[in-house]
Amino acid sequence: LPNPISIAQHAEGARAELDELSFDARVFARAVPARDQTAFRIAEATNASLEPLLAASTAQLFVDGALVGRSSFDAVPAGGEIMQAFGPVEDLRLRYAVLDRSAGDRGLISRSNARTEEVRMTIENLANAPWDIEVMEAIPYSEQDDLVIEWTSTPTAAAENVDDRRGLIQWDISLDAGATQEITVEQVIRWPDGMVLR
């Protein structure tokens, strides 16, 4: 430390600022309507300094000068990527609804079984500013030749198998203040007669 600091008797410790680094960051919201009714603020940046960022078991998180939470912080090498969540975005509301779900025999000749499902995700921006949002949904995938899975979405998904995770799809939307976006996903799962889907 450049200067000595004082620690009060019986205190757990003291905080001292060692350095300050600033990076240009992409700030967006990540939403998983099937799991949560709230989206979360994410900041993504590159460590453009010539030094690594040290890991911390506890880091305080601030947004516009206000403390929003605490989190662990992993070490980041020079030139490495930083991705950090900064708590929920209360002005983004998420809804998830199953519109149709059916199962049974399909076809008079082929005698195949099928299950269909249609879901709708609704994202509403109650803030007075626009938000860029990554919306994620998990869909089933097949590891057997006899099991056929087809799906469509409106609007079309921007990415499939996100981060090499099979069945994870993503939409990238920009939502103006006060605007609402709906996403629908239809799935059809087919399997031969005589087999049981588990």
Short names for language-model regions:
Residues 1-120, 129-163, 168, 175-198:
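Intrinsically disordered, low-complexity Ser/Thr/Pro/Gly-rich interaction regions
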